[in-house]
Amino acid sequence: MELDRHFIERNDFQAVRRGYAALTLEIRGFGERRDRRPAEAREERFDPDSIDPNVTCKHAAMVALLLGRTSLGEKILDLRRAIDTLASFPEIDTGRVYAVGNSGGGTLAWYAACVEPRLRGLILGSCFATYAASIGSVDHCCDNYLPGALRWFDFPDLAAVVAPRPLVVVMGRADPLFPLAGVETAYRRARAIYEAAGAAGRCRLILCEGGHGFRPREAWGAFAELVGG
């Protein structure tokens, strides 16, 4: 399955068709928030074909480290401020705020749910595996890395903070960035945590054929079953 470069826009429409209000974030380093430095200051000068001009997260991540922060932390702040904005609209049911993210967006949603209790459920696509199987052994965007994280926890261990909120994980069996064995190991650990929290029925893993990309039909269908609508 080829990377669907328009999945964010279509996710908006999918959510609205299901009766949800939808807000899409322009993530730092992407789209209108991409790196706008002159070309001679950027990595493309070494290999013009090495970087998608619309995905420029590396420099922002490095500058965040220079400032004693992380790009992931900055993105979490953006997401929390977006929820603040949603909460200012009286027609929004703040008891039913959910996050849907694919790849880096899914990673962001997972970490954000650990510090943002207003996120009441998650759909994560193409992002769920152990550190060792994914970012520890396969080249990834540098903003996926948290300094020192593995000293304290692995990616699925964060379920201890997220549970018992509804969780749907949708992965491709042939995703080169998140190998299947690492996905299955991670989900077993997360599910065990949900079981310990008395919420085994509130998490689900869906494995699809193909590689890296979002699967809306499977994702939304499973999520509707978990949240009842």
Residue ranges with predicted function:
Residues 1-80, 133-138:
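Cap/lid segment of the alpha/beta-hydrolase catalytic domain
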Residues 58-69, 76-82, 96, 119-160, ...:
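Mobile cap/lid helix-loop segments that gate and shape the active-site cleft of serine hydrolases
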Residues 71, 103-106:
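Active-site loop->helix "elbow" adjoining a glycine-rich segment at hydrolase catalytic centers
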Residues 86, 106-117:
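Short glycine-enriched nucleophile-adjacent loop
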Residues 86, 90-103:
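Alpha/beta-hydrolase fold nucleophile elbow
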Residues 162, 169-171:
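Short beta-strand/loop motif that positions the catalytic acidic residue
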Residues 173-178, 213-214:
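Acidic catalytic loop of the alpha/beta-hydrolase fold
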Residues 188, 194-229:
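C-terminal catalytic histidine-bearing segment of alpha/beta-hydrolase fold enzymes
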